[in-house]
């Protein structure tokens, strides 16, 4: 039986589903393609035609990770193939640090490398310092001719010169130096940067930490042997690639060593700072930064990790059988440790010293030789040089005798042996015979009569010294470096002793701080108020608290807490003022302002693109950019303060209301008040403003708010007919205004949105008005006081109270907000008052959400209030509002706020807008999401671009 199939009906019924599946497949394909494109942008493909071994490939990837995509063609054998591959990657690495369209100088590099890649922005300084350089130019010209004959589309010429870098006049802001610093040295590079006007240079050189201690060594990954010869300024270092027939490299050791011994160089008014960034695969990446800012003298510390010598110690042995000349020999730390452990146990005091040395030599030989186990040769330790083996054994033997002698003397010093011995040990030995420190008498005689040989054996020689895991280089910010002591063997023991003394001093200070910290924590436990507050948590009545002055010792934990809170707020305001001055001073300096004009307006243009509050005022009243904001103060050479029309000054957002200096000064000497603090802790919309209206008595009370918007709301509630009257502004003030201009006395102080105030600021206001009690209104679960300086650690910022009343009924929030907030709170604070809150609102459904693609899909209405979590989204909405002619500037300033700015606001219709799907921690923070969800009375709309992981708003309302 045949069955008919209605194809059109099937398509109409299932076409939508099929289309949906097709869209999913396309979306996944596009997503994968975008990921591949993104990876290709982040990585550079490097074609290596040289043959590399698997170990060399691993070394390359260990150096650069996934930053480069290595394409190995394995076409032909080439000398030092890994070094060549790394050199190409080093070019890409250094060039990628600079703007892609700016010109760049290459000191001592190959112009062919850039020309073959059509990188026309790079000028190469390729001086002819010898026949090798001249031959390289001929080879590059040959390659260029070959390329021009094979490619018809090349019409450009290479950009290079044969002048020394310091003699070339080409100007650029950036430069690279790939293995070109060997012949120039650090000072030469700085001079080259100065002649070119270069601000930042990045470069690479081959370096081994052992070069600072040994005369020869091997760079194993690069298969290169190095050797130093000569002395003083004529000392050179030679690089030979092993098992290869190539020209070797000879460079001045003074030039190469300067990259590890100098950090700062000054030419005229320009200071150059060298920073060593990475030392891996025996290639060191460094950068040199030039600055014309005034730099005070300081001591710089720079650490460099020597991974190839960190597991060694230096054993000092006699050189040429001369007791007055010793040299260090590197021996593996494990070898020395095991030899000492075994030899110390087997030491025979009554035997001849030669017998003990034989025992040590036997152990040393066993720990640094080849062992055959089951027919397989296994290397135990590292084999010593045949000329140094017996002297290392002798040095370890003498060191062992010395330790036994010190232990014996130490044991002997525990007994009292009369005044003669006491005199000897204090004035001849210097306090201890065990340590053999030089006493005053012996030191004087040894200096006057050196032939008496009054110094001890230990005073003359050092057998063991740790080479170091990390060397801490110190350098003054002048061209003279203190690191040259690295090359002086006479200073090695002195440096070790200084390091030991410094370490012991740090340990003592650390122990002292730990004891002080314990005492402070015990005192802190006594003054801290528990966070797990319960309902009806009235604290027991206490005796009246005396006032505490700044200079007086607190008489109790609560007085101390209030005293420190006010002091912390004063310090916090002082820090913000210093930050504002520092930022403006930096902007003034880098813009090249001199009192009449700004020489570098491009800097201001760059800053203005990020923050349109940054501007420059010219003498005569002109502004660099159209003035959008009113500024109270400005900054120039005379500092931060009010300015006149005939002055040149810069401004930023801190100049709109610069009151931190006054706040800090006015609160610094205040006494801690002894008044009782009560908190009305209510849910959002519980009627805190109404409660303030009911509780206030104009004759005896004052009202202080956390922000200007709250003050306006309270004035409208208490003085509905004339909120701008003089009496309204006198009794209802912001906390900042109260501290800056003072307050009249009152019996009770009412504080609105107290959680937004620093605890010390609230106490300072109470101290000014001499009130007997404080009634604070707020919500402990909404946004609290936040520091504007992430580096300033707050200890006393949270509000502390003597009693608290909890209100769990709201008159503002609709019914669906109740369940949304309860969903928000689940899994968080189980003692939250919002888990059992109730609403008297008659609105049952108010929440909606909608996904948008861009800010252009946001339609702004005069009847709605717009919220954002970030200032960036707020700026985007403000820009979008300009597309609506009916929305004036006053409306925009009043109806577009961040959630933080909108705390305490109550509106009919609220719209929360998120314009990015990237990470935003504020959408994962309960207190911010709670404020956002509880501002409206009738409707709440959530407009968002893309899904955001961990979005609490979407989870609560969906």
Curated annotation (Swiss-Prot):
It holds the Pfam family CMV_1a_C. Residues 529-557 are annotated as: Disordered. Residues 49-380 are annotated as: Methyltransferase. Residues 71-260 form the Alphavirus-like MT domain. Residues 808-958 form the (+)RNA virus helicase C-terminal domain. It comes from the Viruses. Keywords: ATP-binding, Helicase, Host endoplasmic reticulum, Host membrane, Hydrolase, Membrane, Methyltransferase, Nucleotide-binding, Transferase. Residues 680-943 are annotated as: ATP-dependent helicase. It is a peripheral membrane protein. One of its GO terms (molecular function) is hydrolase activity, acting on acid anhydrides. Residues 652-807 form the (+)RNA virus helicase ATP-binding domain. Residues 533-546 have a biased composition (Basic and acidic residues). Its EC number is 3.6.4.-, 2.1.1.-. ATP binds at residues 682-689. It is found in: Host endoplasmic reticulum membrane. GO terms for cellular component: host cell endoplasmic reticulum membrane; membrane. Interacts with RNA-directed RNA polymerase 2a. Involved in the virus replication. Contains a helicase domain and a methyltransferase domain. The methyltransferase domain is probably involved in viral RNA capping. Involved in the formation of ER membrane spherular invaginations in which RNA replication complexes form. Belongs to the bromoviridae replication protein 1a family. This is Replication protein 1a.
């Amino acid at each position: 039986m045949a069955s008919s199939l209605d194809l059109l009906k099937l398509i109409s019924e299932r076409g939508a589903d099929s289309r949906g599946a097709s869209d999913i497949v396309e979306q996944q394909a596009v997503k994968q393609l975008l990921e591949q494109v993104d990876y290709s942008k982040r990585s550079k493909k490097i074609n290596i035609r040289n043959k590399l071994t698997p170990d060399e490939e691993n070394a390359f990837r260990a150096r650069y990770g996934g930053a480069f995509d290595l394409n190995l063609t394995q076409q032909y054998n080439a000398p030092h193939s890994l070094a060549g591959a790394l050199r190409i990657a080093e070019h890409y690495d250094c060039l990628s640090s600079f703007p892609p369209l700016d010109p760049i100088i290459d000191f001592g590099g190959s112009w062919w490398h850039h020309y073959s890649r059509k990188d026309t922005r790079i000028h190469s300084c390729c001086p002819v310092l010898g026949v090798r350089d001249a031959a390289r130019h001929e080879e590059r010209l040959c390659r260029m001719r070959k390329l021009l004959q094979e490619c018809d589309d090349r019409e450009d010429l290479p950009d290079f010169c044969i002048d020394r870098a310091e003699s070339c006049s080409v100007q650029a802001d950036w430069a690279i130096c790939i293995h070109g610093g060997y012949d120039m040295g650090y000072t030469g590079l700085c001079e080259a940067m100065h002649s070119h006007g270069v601000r930042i240079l990045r470069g690479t050189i081959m370096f081994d930490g052992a070069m600072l201690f040994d005369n020869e060594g091997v760079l194993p990954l690069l298969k290169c042997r190095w050797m130093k010869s000569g002395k003083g300024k004529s000392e050179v270092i030679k690089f030979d690639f092993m098992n290869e027939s190539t020209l070797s490299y000879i460079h001045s050791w003074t030039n190469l060593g300067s990259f590890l011994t100098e950090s700062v160089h000054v030419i005229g008014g320009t200071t150059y700072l060298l920073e060593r960034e990475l030392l891996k695969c025996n290639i060191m990446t460094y950068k040199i930064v030039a600055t014309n800012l005034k730099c005070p003298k300081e001591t710089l510390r720079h650490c460099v990790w020597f991974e190839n010598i960190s597991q060694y110690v230096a054993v000092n042995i006699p050189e040429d059988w001369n007791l007055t000349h010793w040299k260090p020999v590197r021996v593996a730390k494990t070898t020395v440790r095991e030899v000492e452990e075994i030899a110390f146990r087997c030491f025979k005091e009554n035997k001849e010293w030669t017998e003990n040395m034989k025992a040590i030599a036997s152990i040393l030989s066993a720990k640094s030789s080849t062992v055959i186990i089951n027919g397989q040769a296994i290397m135990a330790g590292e084999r010593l040089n045949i000329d140094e083996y017996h002297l290392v054994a002798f040095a370890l033997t003498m060191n062992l005798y010395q330790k036994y002698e010190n232990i014996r003397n130490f044991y002997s010093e525990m007994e009292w042996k009369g005044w003669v011995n006491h005199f000897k040990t204090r004035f001849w030995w210097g306090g201890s015979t065990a340590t053999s420190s030089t006493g005053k008498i012996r030191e004087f005689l040894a200096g006057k009569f050196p032939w008496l040989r009054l110094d001890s054996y230990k005073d003359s020689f050092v057998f063991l010294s740790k080479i170091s895991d990390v060397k801490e280089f110190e350098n003054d910010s002048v061209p003279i470096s203190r690191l040259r002591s690295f090359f002086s063997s006479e200073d090695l023991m002195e440096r070790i002793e200084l390091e030991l003394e410094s370490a012991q001093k740090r340990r003592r200070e650390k122990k002292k701080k730990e004891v002080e910290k314990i005492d402070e924590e015990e005192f802190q436990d006594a003054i801290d108020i528990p966070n797990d507050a319960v309902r009806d948590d009235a604290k027991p009545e206490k005796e009246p608290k005396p006032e505490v002055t700044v200079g007086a010792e607190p008489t109790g934990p609560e007085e101390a807490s209030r005293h420190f809170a006010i002091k912390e707020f004063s310090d916090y305001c002082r820090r913000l003022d210093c930050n504002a001055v520092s930022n403006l001073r930096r902007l003034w300096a880098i813009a090249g302002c001199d009192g009449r004009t700004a020489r570098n307006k491009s800097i201001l243009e760059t800053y203005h693109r990020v923050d349109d509050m940054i501007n420059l005022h010219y003498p005569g009243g002109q502004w660099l950019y159209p003035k959008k904001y009113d500024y109270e103060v400005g900054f120039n050479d005379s500092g931060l303060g009010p300015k006149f029309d005939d002055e040149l000054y810069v401004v930023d957002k801190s100049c709109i209301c610069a009151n931190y200096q006054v706040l800090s000064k006015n609160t610094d000497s205040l006494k801690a008040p002894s008044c009782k603090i009560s908190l009305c802790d209510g849910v959002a919309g519980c009627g805190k403003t109404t409660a303030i209206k009911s509780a206030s008595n104009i004759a005896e009370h004052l009202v202080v708010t956390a922000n200007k918007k709250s003050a306006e709301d309270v004035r409208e509630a208490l003085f509905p007919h004339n909120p701008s009257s003089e009496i309204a502004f006198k009794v209802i003030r912001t906390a900042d205004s109260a501290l800056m201009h003072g307050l009249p006395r009152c019996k009770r102080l009412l504080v609105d949105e107290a959680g937004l105030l620093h605890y010390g600021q609230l106490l300072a206001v109470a101290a000014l008005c001499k009130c007997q009690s404080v009634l604070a209104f707020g919500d402990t679960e909404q946004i609290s006081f936040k520091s504007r300086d992430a580096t300033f650690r707050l200890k006393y910022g949270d509000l502390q109270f003597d009693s608290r009343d909890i209100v769990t009924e709201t008159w503002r929030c609709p019914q669906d907000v109740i369940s949304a907030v309860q969903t928000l709170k689940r899994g968080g604070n189980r003692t939250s008052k919002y888990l059992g809150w109730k609403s008297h609102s008659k609105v049952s459904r108010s929440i909606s959400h909608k996904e948008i693609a861009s800010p252009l899909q946001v339609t702004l209405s005069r009847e709605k209030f717009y919220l954002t979590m970030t200032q960036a989204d707020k700026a985007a909405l403000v820009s979008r509002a300009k597309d609506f002619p009916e929305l004036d500037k006053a409306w925009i300033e009043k109806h577009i706020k961040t959630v933080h700015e909108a705390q305490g606001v109550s509106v009919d219709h609220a719209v929360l807008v998120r314009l990015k799907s990237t990470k935003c921690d504020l959408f994962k923070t309960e207190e911010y999401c709670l404020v956002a969800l509880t501002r409206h009375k009738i409707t709440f709309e959530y407009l968002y671009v893309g899904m955001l992981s961990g979005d609490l708003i979407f989870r609560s309302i969906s």
